[in-house]
């Protein structure tokens, strides 16, 4: 959880700003995103006439798995944040504001806190490539034995055949006889 209390900023005039520094910040962003180290970034929180506008960039080293060789690797990812959070309570009266349940607007909770973890999770998840590679020229795995091809010389006997295809090879041999 990366929660920041913005009660003071909500009581200031529009245009007031605060800076949030995420230096050496570790956070759990869910089972599908694993940080390999601390996040680093700067978020600028600005009071608007409706809520708090958050802008900035965050860098996070993410653990990924190569789609070719299945080896883990670390990729440094930088995301830009540009979102407005609206209060769920009126800043002056502390009375609940009317919120449409279908509204997808990011909200400041009843304790005047913004939890950035869900937003960072979503932004960092969008950086996941369709086909993650540890390096562009990754040779992958041997189709016969499954060993990593990057480990060096890899040989098999020429007559080795994938067991599911063995019956087809026998039929082909009979046809050629």
Residue spans for each PLM region:
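Structured interface patches
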Residues: 1-177
């Amino acid at each position: 959880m990366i929660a920041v209390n913005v009660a003071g900023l909500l009581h200031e005039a529009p245009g007031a700003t605060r800076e949030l520094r995420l230096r050496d910040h570790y956070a759990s962003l869910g089972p599908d995103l694993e940080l390999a180290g601390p996040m680093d970034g700067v978020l600028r929180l600005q009071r608007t006439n409706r809520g708090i506008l958050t802008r900035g960039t965050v860098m996070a080293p993410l653990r990924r798995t190569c789609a070719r060789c299945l080896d883990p690797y670390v990729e440094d990812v930088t995301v830009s944040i540009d979102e407005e959070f609206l209060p769920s309570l009126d800043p002056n009266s502390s009375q609940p504001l009317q919120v449409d349940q279908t509204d997808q607007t990011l909200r400041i909770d009843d304790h005047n806190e913004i939890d950035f973890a869900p937003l960072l999770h979503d932004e960092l998840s969008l950086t996941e490539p369709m086909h993650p590679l540890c390096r562009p020229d990754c040779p992958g795995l041997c189709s016969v034995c499954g060993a990593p091809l990057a480990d060096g010389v890899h040989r098999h006997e020429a007559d080795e055949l994938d067991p599911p295809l063995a019956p087809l090879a026998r039929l082909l041999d009979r046809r050629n006889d």
